[in-house]
Amino acid sequence: MAAFTLALPATARAGHDDNGTDPDNRNQAIKGFSLTANGTKAMNHGKAELERSVITTSWGGGDIEVYDKDYGSNGWHGYADCTDWNALWTSCDIIRVRFNTHWSLTASQWRSLGCHEFGHTADLGHRKKSNDTDNNSCMREEVWPTHYDQHDLNAIKAGT
């Protein structure tokens, strides 16, 4: 008996890929759904950070959908995932961003969280201390910078 394995096609991705939210293009329409003031703050800052890259954004819907609520003590402050892959499973048509209001965060931490989760919508993965030695990337998990560093911006340019 022969066994067959189905493999998804390989795709080019950013330098520190998140393996799951490769945007379908460089023009992303963003829509928030019944956000709290903190969720709105995070979304607005995340959108502004994307604008620093090769990705242009607009308000509307169809590309990035943003939600926030108390998701409980589940270990995450924010989460980004693809809810609608294109027909070939090579890029994401709709990316969902969720902010967890369960945690008490400062205004600066909400901005950092927005930057971080919107970084995932640009196909950025998490950074580690070993490749962010000056602690200035919002893609780090252990610290709370509020901006992408040049490495992040270069990775977005290369991967989208």
Residue ranges and their predicted role:
Residues M1-R13:
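Secretory targeting and sorting signals
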Residues T11-T160:
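Zinc-dependent metalloendopeptidases
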